[in-house]
Swiss-Prot record:
Pfam families: UbiA (PF01040). Belongs to the UbiA prenyltransferase family. Protoheme IX farnesyltransferase subfamily. The chain crosses the membrane at residues 42-62, 67-87, 115-135, 136-156, 163-183, 189-209, 235-255, 256-276, 295-315. It comes from Photobacterium profundum (strain SS9). HAMAP family: CyoE_CtaB (MF_00154). It catalyses: heme b + (2E,6E)-farnesyl diphosphate + H2O = Fe(II)-heme o + diphosphate. This is Protoheme IX farnesyltransferase. It is an enzyme of class 2 (transferase).
Length: 316
């Protein structure tokens, strides 16, 4: 009798165990999906540029409160912008191989929950930055609106120059870091914005060349779709040359020293080298290689900026 009861309970026990396993594995997946919506790797890069802006804003070490609250606030706002981008692009994402598996595109997270999540991050970030100063709070909010609304809703679908115009919002973090520490605008901070702004088109156009068919299928007027791949390659090369010139400005204005001049020149020449290969070498892999190099290029460029600043501070 006991044996038969045990056998009879086996399916129930198995079901309970399966349910427990499902619950234990589904929760981490949900949290991973929410994290995915914030584009953590992109946010990390933005925070690095913001941190460099903070450090360059003052001769010595910036105030701990400004650094901590500034990075948290800018991070929350950047994550909110990314999450709003997921919400607004959820239908478009289903048509592209690069984005079809995103949480909202796959229906793993309900739209209203994503909106609440993004709104919460936005409000928290704004309040934290207000604790520092109103200028940083409102500039960061303007950047969020510029990316999540102006770029995602309008520019992305309106013009092949979407990346150029919309790049202003993505180039703001160094300025935001600067104002978080000083509470005021400075021409040197705008130079940092110019660096990221000039870097943005060749970075994204290299990706757009690699994913041209995806963008064409989704009806997004990226430059390779509207003007062709060869024209876009030429523009990538042109912008890398422009970036080399803009990259000299921090040294020419006395903002940075010789360490930066050498480091940035080598990095920018490397970018030009990749752009030349992209333009003249007959290989489909060069677009992706150029895109990957551009990521490390920006990270290294800002590390060189920071290193030069600290070396100069120690010497003088």
């Amino acid at each position: 009798m006991a044996k038969s009861q045990a056998l009879g309970n086996a399916p129930l026990t198995s079901t309970v165990a399966e349910n427990a396993t499902t619950r234990s594995t589904s929760k981490p997946n949900i949290w991973r999906d929410y994290l995915t919506m914030t584009k953590p790797k992109v946010v990390a890069m933005l925070l690095l540029t913001a941190l460099v802006g903070m450090c360059l804003a003052v001769p010595g070490i910036p105030p701990a409160k400004a650094v901590i609250l500034g990075l948290i606030g800018i991070g929350f706002q950047s994550a909110a912008a990314a999450a709003f981008n997921h919400v607004l692009d959820r239908r478009l994402d289903t048509q592209m191989a690069r984005t079809y598996n995103r949480p909202l595109a796959k229906g793993r997270i309900e739209t209203w929950k994503a909106v609440v999540f993004a709104s919460t991050l936005m409000v928290m970030g704004f309040v934290i930055l207000l604790e520092l100063n109103a200028l940083t709070a409102w500039l960061t909010m303007a950047s969020l609106v510029g990316y999540a609304v102006v770029y995602t809703v309008w520019l992305k679908h309106a013009t092949p120059q979407n990346i150029v115009i919309g790049g202003i919002a993505g180039a703001a973090p160094p300025l935001l870091g600067w104002t978080a520490v000083t509470g005021q605008l400075d021409p040197h901070a705008l130079l940092l914005v110019m660096l990221v702004f000039t870097w943005t088109p060749p970075h994204f156009w290299a990706l757009a060349i690699h994913r041209r068919d995806d963008y064409a299928k989704a009806g997004i007027p990226m430059l390779p779709v509207t003007h062709g791949i060869e024209f876009t390659k030429t523009m990538v090369l042109l912008y890398t040359v422009m970036l080399f010139i803009v990259g000299l400005l921090p040294w020419l204005t006395g903002m940075s020293g010789g360490v930066y001049l050498v480091g940035s020149s080598l990095l920018n020449l490397g970018f030009i080298g990749y752009a030349l290969k992209l333009k003249f070498a007959d290989s489909k892999g060069h677009a992706w290689a150029t895109f990957k190099y551009s990521i490390w290029h920006l990270l290294a460029l800002f590390v060189v900026l920071l290193g030069d600043h600290w070396i100069t501070s120690l010497m003088f």
